[in-house]
Structures are given as C-alpha cells and as structure tokens.
Amino acid sequence: MRRIDIRLGLALLLISTTLAAAELPLERIKLPPGFAIELWARVDNARQMALGHHDDKGGTLFVGSMQAGKVHALSFGANFRVQAVTVVASGLQRPVGVAYRDGSLYVSAVSRILRYDDIERRLAQPPAAVLVTDRLPGETHHGWKFIAFGPDGKLYVPVGAPCNICEPDPQRHANILRMNADGSGPEVYARGVRNSVGFDWQPQTGELWFTDNGRDLLGDDRPPDELNHAPRAGMHFGFPYCHGGNLADPEFGARHSCAEFTAPAQQLSAHVASLGMRFYTGTMFPPEYRNQIFIAEHGSWNRSRKIGYRVTLVRLQGSKAIAYEAFASGWLNGENAWGRPSDVLVLPDGSLLVADDHAGAIYRIIYRR
C-alpha cells in the first residue's frame, strides 16, 4: 500500500508541476543558443538555496523564504527530478538564508541563526531548532540575510545597513561577519558593505566575492550595484562615503576620499537589486562558462523605468572582471514583471537552478549539446 501511495504522490507532483509550468510564460525567457529553461519546482516565496547531501541516487535542496516564513526541503532523484517538497520549518521571521554542513541545516532569521540537526533523516518530522546565535541586529531594514560556510569552515553572515544611507556602527552594521559553526568567535571580515546578499568563493583561489546593493534616491542611473572581491579580511568597500568606487556620497562623501576604499571588481547596473551569486563549477555548460559568475538580479523598485529581473554573467580572466552581460532575461515584459530571480545554484549535474520568489518557482537551465 505504501508503494502505491508513493507512486500516487509522485504522479500528483508531476501533474501539478506540469500544470504550473503551463501558467508561466517560460517561452519568453531569452538564453544563449543551446540553452533551455524548465520549471523544476513550485516553492512559495523562494529565496536562498543550499544543496544538502547528494550522491548518485539523488539528494536534497533546501530553500529559504521571506514573507512566507518557511524553509522547504526538495528531495530529488538520480535524474535530478523533484520527488517531494516538504516544509521543514515555519513561523520564522524572514528565514531567507540557508546553509548546510555535516548533516545539519542552518537558517537565518534576522537576529538569529538556527540549526536543525540530522535534518535529512527527519524530513517527515523535523527536529526542534538549536539556537546558534541570537546576537545579530534585530532591525528588519536590510536585516534579512543569506548565509554560507566558507572554505575556512566559518559561517559567513552579511549584516546590512539599517537605512538607505547613514553612518552606522561598523562593528554592528554594513559589514560581513564570520563565526564558528557553533556561533562563537564572531568577527568582522569586510566593512563598508551597504546590503550584500549573494556571495561565493572563487574555486581557484578560495577568495570571497559578493554582490552589494547601492543606495537609493540619487536618480535612475546611479549609483551602480557592485560585485566586490575580498581576498583578505579587513577591507573596506566604501559605504556610506563612496559608491561604485568613484561616486562620493552627497551626505557623507566629504568625510573620506574614495581613494581610501576598495573599488568594486565590476560595477553592475544601477538598482538591479543584485541578490544571489555563484561561480559556475559544473561541466554541462560550454567550457567558457567554467568558474565564471552568475548573478540573480531581482529587479528595481525605485526607477522610472524598470531594470534587472534577469540572470547576468560576469566573465573573469583570473581574478579580473572583463565583461558583464545578460545570460537569462524575459521575466520583465515592458514595465510588468512576472518573475524576479532571487538566487542561483549549480546542481551536481552542471545544470543551473534559478529561484524566483515572485512567481514562487525554481527553474532549471540546461545546455543541450
């Protein structure tokens, strides 16, 4: 009887996903030749994605959310098709960020980091949360955050400025923190970071790269969003004094010269709301994509003509950015957006997942040789 129930559940999931795909105009998405996009799963308010345990039989993807207050687990098989979607946490305050380490799921919830142990063995009856830390700032303005473990084993946690533009305590806000997995030993890794969301480590060097969202109310085309490179601790990236490496802030810029700070590795378009980013480490895509950066641009809210709502590609030569271009676009139709990319993640088969919190979807981009 249980085998019949499982088969019925998988059939219903396939039917519901097929029907949902018909409701989303995926034919509008423009990709380079040879690429294709499909609906992979429906997940309410999907934000950061983190890959759990996986092997040749399948694995688990964890997905955070904002307004939904939930964390989902997506179980997929050897063919990388989703078999089940399970809510593993709910009722949390903006549990946007998710990270996985040694069988445990870590979740950010504004001022707190929570841990769910032995999670994949307990998806049907998730464990109680263990408090890792509750000492992060409680402001919700830029208070939600992605999280991830670095190559040094530390948990990295961006803490945004609690404002559009202000001069906050640099030990408390506008920085990127790192701490031990148990929450001990927190330290500021990078300063002058207004609102970083996505970050990843370059495969060849192990060095940190991250997106940062520029301030508002300086017009349609300034300041730029930023892609930054932090090869070592202690660097300052300019906020609130300097934006984009060369634009002095009209309120705070007189206090420091832009020359005092680290300029972005790549200026991104103004107000695109650059969120999740990942280095492409797969082998499915052509070789020229290997170790390049994909960025989910959530899209503008404060511009006379909307911009963003796409996935972009930053091409690198070593550790130098040499090009910034659209990779997947079409979620914006004129001034109407039907989707908003929020994160990207490379599956073990080399396909690229794109989370969309507006459409409540996760897409899968594949390359057909």
Question: What are these model-predicted stretches?
Answer:
Residues A22-P33, D56, W144, A161-N164, ...:
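Beta-propeller domain segments
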Residues E38-M66, V272-F279, I295-A296:
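Beta-strand-rich domains and repeat architectures in extracellular enzymes and scaffolds
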Residues L39-D44, T86-G91, V132-E139, V188-G192, ...:
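Surface loop/turn motifs at the tips and blade-to-blade linkers of beta-strand repeat domains
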Residues M49, V98, I147, S196-F199, ...:
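Hydrophobic core register within WD40 beta-propeller blades
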Residues K57-V63, S104-V107, K154-P158, E207-T211, ...:
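Conserved beta-propeller blade signature
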Residues S65-Q67, V110-R112, D118, G160-P162, ...:
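Short loop/turn segments immediately following the C-termini of beta-strands
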Residues A99, S111-G150, P158-P162, G185, ...:
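Asp-box/WD-like beta-propeller blade repeats and closely related beta-sheet repeat scaffolds
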Residues L345-R369:
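Blade-level signature of beta-propeller repeat domains, shared across WD40, Kelch, NHL, RCC1
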